Every structure is written in C-alpha cells, then in structure tokens.
C-alpha cells in the first residue's frame, strides 16, 4: 500500500503547483524575493517608511463555499477570500503587501482548485498584493467529494504616524458608507436556510432581482476597496477612522473604529438597500434587527471624516465609481448605534 492508495496523490499535487505557478507569479511585486516552492516566502519591506508598522489579518469565506461548490462555480470565492483579508487590513490605513492562502480538500481536483486560485490571483491584482505562497492540503475522509475549505492571510504596511486606530475619531464627525456589491461573504448559513426552507434552487429568479438568479447574485464577489481607499488616504481627504462591515453587520463592526465614549447616530433610510436583502427578509420572514445584525445591508465599508469634509468625500468616492452615502454622525455614547433600534 502507498500514499496514493490511502487517498493522497502527491504527484497530482506537484502538477497542480506547476499549473498555477505562472498565474501566481503574475501577482509578484518588485519586493518579492525568490519564487514558489521554498519553505517560506520572502518579501523585502518597501523603502520610504520612517517607522513602518506591519498589519496582519486572516479570514475565510464561510459557508458561501457551499453555494460555490453546489453550482460548480469556484472563481468568485477566490476573490472573496482576498477581499475579506485585505479590506480588514485596510481599515488601519495599511497598504496590503502580500497574501497567503490555505486550501484543504478531500480529493485534489486540479481544474476546480485552479479556478479558486485564479480568483485569488484576480483579487491580488485588484488589491496590488503579491500572492507570496500557500498550502494545498489533500485530506481524504475529512472532506466529502468536491468539498474544500479556504483560509487567507494578509500582511500590509503603514507609517506609524498614519496608523488609524480609532483615536482620531471625534464627536460630530460624519459617517460615510460605501456601497457593497451584495451579500459579500457573511450570513450564508442564514441564506442557505431561507432557500432550503422555501424549497427553492439557486437557479430561481425572483422578480425583484430582474432576471438574475439567486445563485448569480449571491456569488457576486466581495467588493475590494483597496484602490479607492489608498488613493483617498494619499489625497487631501482627512480620514479619521474606517470599518469593514462583515459578520455582525453595522452594529458589530462600526463601533470597532470608535473610542469608548462614542456612538453613531444612523439614518437607516440614507442609503440603498439592495434587492437581494429585501428578498431575503421577505422570503425568510427575517426581522429588521436580525437582518442588520447578520448582513451588511448594502454598506460594505465605512469611512469617518470631519463633518466639513463630508460633501467632498461623498463626491470623491462617487466620482471614483463607488457609491457613497452620508449615513450618520459620531455622537457621545458607549458604542451603541442609535437609529437601528428595531
């Protein structure tokens, strides 16, 4: 008996690495030293920093993977994986430098996993982030046929004096929401439960989605905000704080960029609620409170700016093709979002 008979095909693993090698290397920045295949990846710290601070983040895609696997559509979740990590790192004002991925599967399917990696590569290009390395683990008996799981890891850099940690946020600051591209990568256990309870398939096209299927809309990749945010930070805009709206929605994530004595007064009618959220709420009879505490509800990223820069900030992002909304202001409090009391 050998390893292949036990379910692990080492040769297929080597062939897979060769298959993706050129695409991975297409993401490499000048700071990348060496190529794939070593025990570690090497990245030279960029020049021009007086007191560089490294910022790290890690995340996954959650049960959205079940949808991708069910529809045999694997490219977009690779983009999701990068987005979830780089957007987190971005909230500190950091520029993403490099990314690593961990991919585990029951049986190596080179075509399937190549699609995933192609998505990761695209996400890295969108965030100007080098795919420095990764791990592909074949684990027979642990995952079912066609199943895989993903984890991502990102490291970014920011000048220490420019680090955003919430301390700059002031009472009276304006809260600007940047539109999400859809459900992004959180809340899919509830999404799947709603669709299952309704006895629907992912091919179902609700009228409110105007001809698009549930699967098509739900697999829309998470918006990557790196380029517009880094450009904003390099402009004359003064950004005091930022938040990535992920699991737990606005109520859980927005307070993470505030000081202990601050809250936000939110106007929930100030931005567009995407049709997919309206459908989920109606089909699943989900309360407004549960919706806002589970999903991003159309706001994927938040920037906090001085109130006298609110209009300039709105115009700046809208001109960049990112829908922006003035959705509230920072007030005295203890982190509770006033206005979302459903």
Swiss-Prot record:
It is found in: Cytoplasm. It catalyses: 2-formamido-N(1)-(5-O-phospho-beta-D-ribosyl)acetamidine + ATP = 5-amino-1-(5-phospho-beta-D-ribosyl)imidazole + ADP + phosphate + H(+). InterPro entries: PurM-like_C_dom (IPR010918), PurM-like_C_sf (IPR036676), PurM-like_N (IPR016188), PurM-like_N_sf (IPR036921), PurM_cligase (IPR004733). Pathway: Purine metabolism; IMP biosynthesis via de novo pathway; 5-amino-1-(5-phospho-D-ribosyl)imidazole from N(2)-formyl-N(1)-(5-phospho-D-ribosyl)glycinamide: step 2/2. It comes from the Bacteria. The keyword Cytoplasm applies. One of its GO terms (biological process) is adenine biosynthetic process. It is an enzyme of class 6 (ligase). Disulfide bonds: none annotated. Keywords: ATP-binding, Cytoplasm, Ligase, Nucleotide-binding, Purine biosynthesis. Its EC number is 6.3.3.1. One of its GO terms (cellular component) is cytosol. Its main location: cytoplasm. The keyword Ligase applies. GO terms for molecular function: ATP binding; phosphoribosylamine-glycine ligase activity; phosphoribosylformylglycinamidine cyclo-ligase activity. Belongs to the AIR synthase family. PANTHER family: TRIFUNCTIONAL PURINE BIOSYNTHETIC PROTEIN ADENOSINE-3, TRIFUNCTIONAL PURINE BIOSYNTHETIC PROTEIN ADENOSINE-3-RELATED. This is Phosphoribosylformylglycinamidine cyclo-ligase. It comes from Gloeothece citriformis (strain PCC 7424) (Cyanothece sp. (strain PCC 7424)).
